[in-house]
Amino acid sequence: MEHEQELREFTISSVNELGLTAGEVHAEQFMRYLIHLIEWNKTINLTSIIDPMEIIIKHFVDSLVALVATSFPQNGVVLDAGSGGGFPGIPLKIMRPDLRLVLVEPVLKKCSFLNSVIGLLKLEDVSTFDGTIEQYAKQPPRHVIDMVVVRALKYEEIRKHIPALLTSKGKVVLYRAGAIKNEEIGIDFHLVSEIALMLPQGFGKRVITVIEKNI
């Protein structure tokens, strides 16, 4: 890829600007992911963003904001609802390889892409499910989920299916543009925290809302 070294340095500096610690190993994985994403995006609609630097900030770094806003349990099981091109799940896994990840994606071609990324990056303890959250919830339990991350989907549309997936006191991490309203949270959950953070390079604000299962 043209300007690859510049993009590596840009990735490291942008992630570090969040308050995380990224090095060459992380940059290598993000670059391989970036190149693979751009190539597959030529035939599958994975993202409308085509500029590499914008992908780095608006997808990779944006996905990592949750690591600053809240704590993820060591070796915790995290379900990415509507993973699409792998956001936020795969960037989270790159920075937190201890996490056990479930990527739920209903579009078969996108699920194929996710499986190819898992193989390319040699990611361990990552599985995919070709279906919706509703369909996943109806399956025999595969994992006890500690956290559900929701970035691409509307939380209100999948809210009723989430409680059955979560362990007691399990959490949902919502990537939002603005604050959540009390009536949007639902009777099965309560608000734990809500933090607004600015993305690096002046790319705007991201709100991370964390809600917890009541029992």
Over which residues does each language-model region extend?
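Residue-level preference for alpha-helix termini and adjacent loops
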Residues: 45-48, 54, 86, 144, ...
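Conserved SAM/SAH-binding loop-helix junction
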Residues: 65, 87, 91, 109-112, ...
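Conserved glycine-centered beta->alpha loop in an early N-terminal alpha/beta scaffold
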Residues: 82
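Conserved SAM-binding loop of SAM-dependent methyltransferases across substrates and taxa
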Residues: 85-98, 160-162
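S-adenosylmethionine
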Residues: 98-100, 106-215
